[in-house]
Amino acid sequence: MVSAMAAPDPDILLLLAPDFTDAEGRRCYCPACATVEGLLGYYPALRQALTIRYIGFARPRAEVVALIGAANQGLPALVLADATPVELLADLAVRTGNGRRFLQGPASIGRYLARRYGSGEPH
């Protein structure tokens, strides 16, 4: 079951802010980020368990660069708490940037959240 209490060193979920304007001036949204938003809607307690940051579309994305490096600006990303047990990461594509472990993409993020917080797992 998802705990409503945030950990002292919480995982940090980075999502593109919804309804952004791209370089051509079109209103857009990120489908992968929308999938993760849907997961947060299904399991609202995840919002209390995670630190969630909405990032603007334009690059460079300073907050993302500071956390996981310039080469890793694709979102969604979940920056893992330093104390994350390695057994929760089995078979997930864990990446490293700026000394931090992170996951990218809704499927990996969803599987991790299920293991860590007890939400449903992607099927």
Q: PLM features: what roles do these ranges have?
A:
Residues V2-H123:
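GST-like domain detector, emphasizing the conserved glutathione-binding G-site
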